[in-house]
């Protein structure tokens, strides 16, 4: 495969938003390295599926290495994998803490560090793009959804998005974040949909396509970096 074809790494890619992103990046002409803890092989020669726990410090470097080995480069990274545990703060356990920080922070760190290093080896002034997935709960906390660990970890991603955007702006790597509201995915039981829809001023849950389109917009928006793009049906604006 030509080393001039752009290459994206997408985590949490086996279902939901991640699976939608794999299809979207292929439509943009990218080869894709798709990771999830459990993921089946793809019949598409432009998609390399790699099973692995993103919380394992060895998984991120392995994904970047395989992207370069199979496709020759890395141009985009979508840190889609994430864990959300809603509990009262005093009920969180050490296991909860390790799980959430392992995926949301440790997984982000080791993969993004290696991915940016690979992007910097690309020629030209537009070398790469990182997109993180956050949550609108950081900006609009709700008594109905106690989420201190999400705020701790995803809030950190919002902050590091701005930090990395400035650090690498002059070197051709952009860094942005999408902060979704509640999205209609298999993780939400159908009987909860009405209640979840009521938490958004627009009166509905988000769809997978809403997030995929936001991310592909950022992928092509060359003047956007350091952006926290809320795709939350108005949640972050208020009620």
Where are these regions (language model features)?
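Conserved glycine-rich cofactor-binding loop
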Residues: 14-15
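Substrate-binding pocket helix/loop in short-chain dehydrogenase/reductase
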Residues: 88-89, 96-99, 196
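Catalytic loop of short-chain dehydrogenase/reductase
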Residues: 124-156, 161-170
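Conserved NAD(P)H cofactor-binding loop of Rossmann-fold oxidoreductase domains
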Residues: 80-85, 233-234
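Short, small/polar-rich loop/turn modules that mediate ligand/substrate recognition or access, typified
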Residues: 169, 174, 225-226
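A short, exposed helix-loop element centered on a Lys and neighboring polar residues
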Residues: 112-113, 162
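C-terminal substrate-recognition "lid" of short-chain dehydrogenase/reductases
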Residues: 207-231, 236
């Amino acid at each position: 495969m030509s080393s001039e074809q752009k290459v994206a790494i997408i985590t949490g890619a086996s279902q939901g938003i991640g699976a939608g992103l794999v299809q979207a990046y292929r439509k943009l002409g990218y080869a894709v390295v798709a990771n999830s803890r459990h993921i089946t092989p793809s019949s598409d020669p432009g998609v390399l599926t790699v099973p692995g726990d993103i919380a394992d410090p060895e998984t991120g470097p392995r994904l970047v290495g395989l992207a370069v080995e199979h496709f020759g480069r890395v141009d985009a990274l979508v840190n889609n994998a994430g864990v959300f545990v809603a509990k009262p703060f005093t009920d969180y356990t050490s296991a909860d803490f390790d799980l959430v920080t392992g995926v949301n922070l440790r997984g982000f760190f080791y993969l993004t560090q290696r991915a940016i290093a690979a992007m910097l080896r690309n020629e030209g002034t537009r070398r790469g793009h990182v997109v993180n997935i956050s949550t609108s709960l950081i900006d609009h906390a709700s008594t109905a959804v106690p989420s201190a660990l999400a705020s701790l970890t995803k809030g950190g991603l919002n902050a590091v998005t701005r930090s990395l955007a400035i650090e690498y702006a002059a070197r051709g790597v952009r860094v942005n974040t999408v902060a979704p509201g509640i999205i209609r995915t298999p993780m939400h039981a159908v009987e909860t949909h009405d209640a979840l829809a009521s938490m958004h001023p627009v009166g509905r849950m988000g769809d997978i396509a809403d997030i995929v389109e936001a991310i592909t917009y950022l992928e092509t928006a060359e003047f956007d970096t350091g952006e926290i793009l809320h795709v939350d049906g108005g949640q972050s604006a208020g009620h």
